[in-house]
Amino acid sequence: MFELLLHAFPVAFALASFWSNTERKLLLMNLGLCIAIGSLLVFEQAWGGAVVITVAGLSTSYRLIKQKLLSPVATYITLISMMVIVLTVNNLTGKTSLVEAMPVLTFMAYRFGELHCKEAGLRVCMIIGSINFTAYGIITQTWGLAITEALFAASNLWYYMKLRRAM
């Protein structure tokens, strides 16, 4: 029953993301997803994904608190530093396959969007990251993650299309 709840909690956040019509709501929803998916990945012992999600939650928190974008240089330094942390943990745990690197690719797309892009760019980065993380969830048979990320990609695509029409 507990495992079912861990899989359902992120899906509930993903469904709620269809009401994240502003950048702030999107970031708050992403923070909630980080907590929910992080808990699920720890339970599933998918440590690479869990580390990625933890660092992602910190990045999302920074953007919510500061409410400003980083300069290009600061963005790249931050991304590289975070990527090194995640890849180091993967290496220490012996998780060095391409599948274990997929969360890092998602992480890079999400963090670039959060730290450097305004709403439209942020949504594009989240669409790309969510599609990749959906594939990771399917490959690792973490179904709550796969469904969540597919829904999150769909909601971001919906709002991105609305933004493009408004421009």
What are these regions (language model features)?
Residues M1-M167:
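Alpha-helical membrane-protein topology signature
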